[in-house]
């Protein structure tokens, strides 16, 4: 039941975060983009989408750890569940106006991907 509740949250989050990211995608001309390094970038869409996902997960499952591409990892112990998030998987295509990007969310426990 506990895993099902996480799966249900994940499903809802993908829709909510996807809608937020799509709003930015539809308004690319006003999007702020920064370089994270050689051939690596982050946009305000990445950051804000990850913050949304992270806050919803923390509210529902405060005992779980979080690893986000943009915000990093929270404290994590062996056996603890961890959410692994790439808020906009495919930032380069996203900022280039190409539609081959997505919101990626996984939940891992005991080194096994649960979903």
Give names to the regions the model predicted.
Residues 1-88:
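N-terminal subdomain of lithium-sensitive/metallo-dependent phosphomonoesterases centered on the IMPase/IPPase/PAP
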Residues 77-115:
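DPxDG-like acidic metal-binding loop motif
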